[in-house]
Amino acid sequence: MTDLSFSPRPLSPGGRREPPLRPEYERTVTATGPIGDVARPLSPWERLSNVTALRRLLVLAAVAGLWQAAAVWQNNPLMFPTFTDTAAALWDGIRHDGLLSMAWTSLSVLLKGYAVALVLAVLLTTVAVSTRIGNDLLSTLTSMFNPLPAIALLPIAMLWFGLGEVSLIFVLVHAVLWPLALNTHAGFTSVSETLRMAGRNYGLGGLRYVVTLLIPAAFPAILTGLKVGWAFAWRTLIAAELVFGVSSGKGGLGWFIFQNRNELYIDKVFAGLVTVILIGLLVENVVFRWIEVHTVRKWGMVR
Protein backbone atom coordinates (compact mmCIF):
# COMPACT_ATOMS: atom_id res chain seq x y z
CA MET A 1 0.00 0.00 0.00
CA THR A 2 1.40 3.42 -0.92
CA ASP A 3 2.17 5.73 1.95
CA LEU A 4 0.47 9.03 1.25
CA SER A 5 1.50 10.77 4.45
CA PHE A 6 3.02 14.19 4.11
CA SER A 7 6.54 14.86 5.39
CA PRO A 8 7.19 18.24 7.01
CA ARG A 9 9.83 20.43 5.45
CA PRO A 10 12.50 22.33 7.39
CA LEU A 11 12.27 26.00 8.09
CA SER A 12 13.50 28.38 5.40
CA PRO A 13 16.26 30.89 6.18
CA GLY A 14 13.58 33.51 6.74
CA GLY A 15 11.94 31.45 9.46
CA ARG A 16 8.98 30.31 7.36
CA ARG A 17 8.07 26.68 6.99
CA GLU A 18 7.83 25.40 3.42
CA PRO A 19 4.65 23.52 2.41
CA PRO A 20 4.84 19.75 2.85
CA LEU A 21 5.79 17.51 -0.02
CA ARG A 22 3.41 14.76 -1.15
CA PRO A 23 5.16 11.65 -2.41
CA GLU A 24 4.48 10.84 -6.05
CA TYR A 25 2.52 7.72 -6.84
CA GLU A 26 0.90 6.10 -9.83
CA ARG A 27 -2.50 4.48 -10.07
CA THR A 28 -2.96 1.51 -12.32
CA VAL A 29 -6.04 1.77 -14.54
CA THR A 30 -7.92 -1.50 -14.73
CA ALA A 31 -10.27 -2.38 -17.56
CA THR A 32 -13.90 -2.47 -16.47
CA GLY A 33 -15.35 -3.99 -19.65
CA PRO A 34 -18.45 -2.80 -21.51
CA ILE A 35 -20.51 -0.17 -19.72
CA GLY A 36 -24.28 -0.33 -20.23
CA ASP A 37 -25.59 0.67 -23.65
CA VAL A 38 -22.34 2.27 -24.82
CA ALA A 39 -20.90 -0.95 -26.20
CA ARG A 40 -24.22 -2.54 -27.13
CA PRO A 41 -24.74 -2.66 -30.91
CA LEU A 42 -27.93 -1.07 -32.19
CA SER A 43 -30.63 -3.34 -33.48
CA PRO A 44 -31.81 -2.97 -37.11
CA TRP A 45 -35.02 -1.33 -35.90
CA GLU A 46 -33.06 1.22 -33.83
CA ARG A 47 -30.81 2.02 -36.79
CA LEU A 48 -33.82 2.54 -39.05
CA SER A 49 -35.57 4.70 -36.45
CA ASN A 50 -32.60 7.09 -36.52
CA VAL A 51 -33.21 7.89 -40.21
CA THR A 52 -35.29 11.09 -40.32
CA ALA A 53 -36.49 10.60 -43.91
CA LEU A 54 -37.77 7.11 -43.12
CA ARG A 55 -39.69 8.33 -40.06
CA ARG A 56 -41.37 11.03 -42.10
CA LEU A 57 -42.25 8.59 -44.87
CA LEU A 58 -43.86 6.37 -42.25
CA VAL A 59 -45.94 9.32 -41.06
CA LEU A 60 -47.07 10.04 -44.63
CA ALA A 61 -47.87 6.37 -45.17
CA ALA A 62 -49.96 6.33 -41.99
CA VAL A 63 -51.87 9.43 -43.13
CA ALA A 64 -52.50 7.85 -46.55
CA GLY A 65 -53.71 4.64 -44.89
CA LEU A 66 -56.12 6.51 -42.62
CA TRP A 67 -57.35 8.53 -45.61
CA GLN A 68 -58.00 5.36 -47.62
CA ALA A 69 -59.79 3.65 -44.72
CA ALA A 70 -61.98 6.67 -43.94
CA ALA A 71 -62.95 7.15 -47.61
CA VAL A 72 -63.80 3.47 -48.07
CA TRP A 73 -65.86 3.51 -44.88
CA GLN A 74 -67.78 6.64 -45.98
CA ASN A 75 -68.29 5.25 -49.50
CA ASN A 76 -69.14 8.59 -51.13
CA PRO A 77 -66.65 9.59 -53.86
CA LEU A 78 -68.42 12.91 -54.45
CA MET A 79 -67.70 13.94 -50.88
CA PHE A 80 -64.44 12.20 -50.05
CA PRO A 81 -62.55 10.25 -52.73
CA THR A 82 -60.13 7.53 -51.71
CA PHE A 83 -56.38 7.99 -51.67
CA THR A 84 -55.97 5.64 -54.62
CA ASP A 85 -58.56 7.54 -56.69
CA THR A 86 -56.82 10.82 -55.84
CA ALA A 87 -53.43 9.38 -56.82
CA ALA A 88 -54.90 8.22 -60.14
CA ALA A 89 -56.45 11.65 -60.73
CA LEU A 90 -53.11 13.28 -59.91
CA TRP A 91 -51.32 11.13 -62.47
CA ASP A 92 -54.04 11.79 -65.05
CA GLY A 93 -53.80 15.53 -64.38
CA ILE A 94 -50.05 15.44 -64.93
CA ARG A 95 -50.38 13.49 -68.18
CA HIS A 96 -53.43 15.10 -69.79
CA ASP A 97 -54.56 18.25 -67.94
CA GLY A 98 -51.30 20.17 -67.71
CA LEU A 99 -51.20 20.05 -63.93
CA LEU A 100 -47.44 20.58 -63.81
CA SER A 101 -47.62 23.68 -66.02
CA MET A 102 -50.39 25.06 -63.80
CA ALA A 103 -48.28 24.37 -60.73
CA TRP A 104 -45.35 26.21 -62.30
CA THR A 105 -47.61 29.15 -63.19
CA SER A 106 -48.69 29.47 -59.57
CA LEU A 107 -45.18 28.91 -58.28
CA SER A 108 -43.66 31.57 -60.54
CA VAL A 109 -46.17 34.17 -59.35
CA LEU A 110 -45.58 33.13 -55.74
CA LEU A 111 -41.80 33.48 -56.08
CA LYS A 112 -42.16 36.98 -57.52
CA GLY A 113 -44.39 38.12 -54.68
CA TYR A 114 -42.17 36.39 -52.12
CA ALA A 115 -39.05 38.10 -53.50
CA VAL A 116 -40.65 41.56 -53.44
CA ALA A 117 -41.85 40.99 -49.86
CA LEU A 118 -38.37 39.81 -48.84
CA VAL A 119 -36.73 42.98 -50.18
CA LEU A 120 -39.30 45.22 -48.48
CA ALA A 121 -38.92 43.30 -45.20
CA VAL A 122 -35.14 43.79 -45.28
CA LEU A 123 -35.54 47.53 -45.89
CA LEU A 124 -38.15 47.97 -43.16
CA THR A 125 -36.15 45.96 -40.65
CA THR A 126 -32.95 47.87 -41.45
CA VAL A 127 -34.69 51.19 -40.80
CA ALA A 128 -36.38 49.82 -37.65
CA VAL A 129 -33.12 48.52 -36.17
CA SER A 130 -31.18 51.69 -37.04
CA THR A 131 -33.54 54.43 -35.82
CA ARG A 132 -36.23 54.94 -33.22
CA ILE A 133 -38.67 56.39 -35.72
CA GLY A 134 -38.08 53.34 -37.90
CA ASN A 135 -38.86 51.08 -34.96
CA ASP A 136 -42.08 52.99 -34.31
CA LEU A 137 -42.94 52.84 -38.01
CA LEU A 138 -42.52 49.07 -38.23
CA SER A 139 -44.37 48.48 -34.97
CA THR A 140 -47.30 50.63 -36.10
CA LEU A 141 -47.51 49.13 -39.59
CA THR A 142 -47.37 45.53 -38.35
CA SER A 143 -50.03 46.28 -35.74
CA MET A 144 -52.26 47.72 -38.47
CA PHE A 145 -51.74 45.31 -41.35
CA ASN A 146 -50.57 42.00 -39.88
CA PRO A 147 -54.04 41.08 -38.53
CA LEU A 148 -55.64 42.05 -41.86
CA PRO A 149 -56.24 38.95 -44.02
CA ALA A 150 -54.71 39.24 -47.46
CA ILE A 151 -57.92 37.90 -48.99
CA ALA A 152 -59.69 41.03 -47.70
CA LEU A 153 -57.55 43.11 -50.05
CA LEU A 154 -58.81 41.28 -53.13
CA PRO A 155 -61.50 43.89 -54.00
CA ILE A 156 -58.91 46.69 -53.76
CA ALA A 157 -56.41 44.73 -55.83
CA MET A 158 -59.04 44.07 -58.50
CA LEU A 159 -59.98 47.76 -58.56
CA TRP A 160 -56.41 49.04 -58.75
CA PHE A 161 -54.69 46.45 -60.93
CA GLY A 162 -57.45 44.45 -62.64
CA LEU A 163 -57.43 40.69 -63.05
CA GLY A 164 -53.90 39.54 -63.56
CA GLU A 165 -50.50 38.81 -62.13
CA VAL A 166 -49.95 42.24 -60.55
CA SER A 167 -53.04 41.83 -58.38
CA LEU A 168 -51.83 38.44 -57.19
CA ILE A 169 -48.38 39.82 -56.40
CA PHE A 170 -49.97 42.66 -54.44
CA VAL A 171 -51.88 40.37 -52.10
CA LEU A 172 -48.89 38.01 -51.83
CA VAL A 173 -46.63 40.85 -50.71
CA HIS A 174 -49.14 41.79 -48.05
CA ALA A 175 -49.37 38.20 -46.83
CA VAL A 176 -45.59 37.68 -46.59
CA LEU A 177 -44.22 41.10 -45.65
CA TRP A 178 -45.58 41.62 -42.15
CA PRO A 179 -44.82 38.24 -40.52
CA LEU A 180 -41.39 38.19 -42.17
CA ALA A 181 -40.52 41.73 -41.05
CA LEU A 182 -41.87 41.07 -37.56
CA ASN A 183 -39.82 37.90 -37.08
CA THR A 184 -36.69 39.49 -38.54
CA HIS A 185 -36.97 42.52 -36.27
CA ALA A 186 -37.62 40.29 -33.25
CA GLY A 187 -34.50 38.29 -34.10
CA PHE A 188 -32.28 41.38 -34.18
CA THR A 189 -33.73 42.88 -31.00
CA SER A 190 -33.31 39.59 -29.11
CA VAL A 191 -29.52 39.56 -29.56
CA SER A 192 -28.15 39.91 -26.03
CA GLU A 193 -26.08 42.89 -24.94
CA THR A 194 -23.38 40.50 -23.76
CA LEU A 195 -22.96 39.16 -27.28
CA ARG A 196 -22.98 42.66 -28.73
CA MET A 197 -20.29 43.80 -26.29
CA ALA A 198 -18.20 40.71 -27.07
CA GLY A 199 -18.33 41.59 -30.76
CA ARG A 200 -17.21 45.15 -30.09
CA ASN A 201 -14.40 43.90 -27.86
CA TYR A 202 -13.16 41.84 -30.80
CA GLY A 203 -13.02 44.98 -32.89
CA LEU A 204 -16.11 44.35 -34.99
CA GLY A 205 -17.85 47.40 -36.36
CA GLY A 206 -20.02 48.64 -39.20
CA LEU A 207 -21.04 46.14 -41.87
CA ARG A 208 -18.63 43.52 -40.53
CA TYR A 209 -20.34 43.72 -37.14
CA VAL A 210 -23.76 43.21 -38.73
CA VAL A 211 -22.75 40.37 -41.05
CA THR A 212 -20.47 38.52 -38.63
CA LEU A 213 -22.46 38.85 -35.40
CA LEU A 214 -25.98 40.27 -35.68
CA ILE A 215 -27.28 38.30 -38.67
CA PRO A 216 -26.04 34.87 -37.44
CA ALA A 217 -27.42 35.57 -33.95
CA ALA A 218 -30.80 36.62 -35.36
CA PHE A 219 -30.97 33.98 -38.10
CA PRO A 220 -33.15 31.42 -36.22
CA ALA A 221 -35.92 34.02 -36.00
CA ILE A 222 -35.29 35.12 -39.60
CA LEU A 223 -35.59 31.51 -40.81
CA THR A 224 -38.85 31.12 -38.88
CA GLY A 225 -40.16 34.24 -40.59
CA LEU A 226 -39.19 32.87 -44.00
CA LYS A 227 -41.08 29.63 -43.31
CA VAL A 228 -44.17 31.40 -41.98
CA GLY A 229 -44.14 33.78 -44.93
CA TRP A 230 -43.90 30.88 -47.38
CA ALA A 231 -46.91 29.15 -45.80
CA PHE A 232 -48.94 32.37 -45.83
CA ALA A 233 -48.00 32.95 -49.46
CA TRP A 234 -49.36 29.56 -50.56
CA ARG A 235 -52.62 30.08 -48.67
CA THR A 236 -53.11 33.51 -50.16
CA LEU A 237 -52.20 32.46 -53.69
CA ILE A 238 -54.63 29.55 -53.84
CA ALA A 239 -57.43 31.66 -52.36
CA ALA A 240 -56.72 34.51 -54.77
CA GLU A 241 -56.64 32.21 -57.80
CA LEU A 242 -59.97 30.77 -56.75
CA VAL A 243 -61.37 34.30 -57.09
CA PHE A 244 -59.28 35.64 -59.97
CA GLY A 245 -59.48 32.38 -61.89
CA VAL A 246 -56.29 32.88 -63.88
CA SER A 247 -52.95 34.61 -63.48
CA SER A 248 -51.17 36.14 -66.46
CA GLY A 249 -53.72 34.62 -68.83
CA LYS A 250 -52.97 31.09 -67.62
CA GLY A 251 -54.73 28.94 -65.08
CA GLY A 252 -52.91 28.14 -61.85
CA LEU A 253 -53.51 25.51 -59.20
CA GLY A 254 -56.35 27.53 -57.70
CA TRP A 255 -58.05 27.63 -61.09
CA PHE A 256 -57.50 23.89 -61.53
CA ILE A 257 -59.22 23.26 -58.18
CA PHE A 258 -62.05 25.70 -58.91
CA GLN A 259 -62.75 24.37 -62.41
CA ASN A 260 -62.87 20.73 -61.34
CA ARG A 261 -65.09 21.56 -58.39
CA ASN A 262 -67.61 23.14 -60.75
CA GLU A 263 -67.51 19.99 -62.89
CA LEU A 264 -67.77 17.75 -59.79
CA TYR A 265 -64.43 16.03 -60.42
CA ILE A 266 -63.78 15.85 -56.71
CA ASP A 267 -60.88 13.45 -57.11
CA LYS A 268 -59.13 16.08 -59.26
CA VAL A 269 -59.94 18.73 -56.66
CA PHE A 270 -58.12 16.60 -54.08
CA ALA A 271 -55.34 16.04 -56.60
CA GLY A 272 -54.84 19.81 -56.81
CA LEU A 273 -54.76 20.06 -53.03
CA VAL A 274 -52.24 17.22 -52.84
CA THR A 275 -50.07 19.06 -55.38
CA VAL A 276 -49.98 22.09 -53.09
CA ILE A 277 -49.06 19.84 -50.16
CA LEU A 278 -46.31 18.08 -52.10
CA ILE A 279 -44.74 21.37 -53.17
CA GLY A 280 -44.88 22.56 -49.57
CA LEU A 281 -43.21 19.38 -48.32
CA LEU A 282 -40.54 19.64 -51.00
CA VAL A 283 -39.68 23.24 -50.16
CA GLU A 284 -39.73 22.59 -46.40
CA ASN A 285 -37.62 19.43 -46.47
CA VAL A 286 -35.21 20.39 -49.25
CA VAL A 287 -34.81 24.17 -49.49
CA PHE A 288 -35.40 25.27 -45.91
CA ARG A 289 -33.77 22.12 -44.57
CA TRP A 290 -30.62 22.84 -46.59
CA ILE A 291 -30.54 26.42 -45.30
CA GLU A 292 -31.03 25.23 -41.73
CA VAL A 293 -28.30 22.57 -41.91
CA HIS A 294 -25.75 24.99 -43.38
CA THR A 295 -26.54 27.83 -40.98
CA VAL A 296 -28.15 27.45 -37.56
CA ARG A 297 -27.38 23.74 -37.16
CA LYS A 298 -23.82 24.22 -38.35
CA TRP A 299 -23.41 27.06 -35.86
CA GLY A 300 -24.80 24.90 -33.03
CA MET A 301 -27.81 27.16 -32.40
CA VAL A 302 -30.45 24.41 -32.70
CA ARG A 303 -30.40 20.67 -32.17
Feature annotation, model-predicted:
Residues 41-49, 72-116, 255:
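Periplasmic/extracellular loop-to-transmembrane helix junction in inner-membrane transport proteins
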Residues 132, 189, 266, 270-303:
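C-terminal transmembrane helix and the adjacent membrane-cytosol boundary/short C-terminal tail
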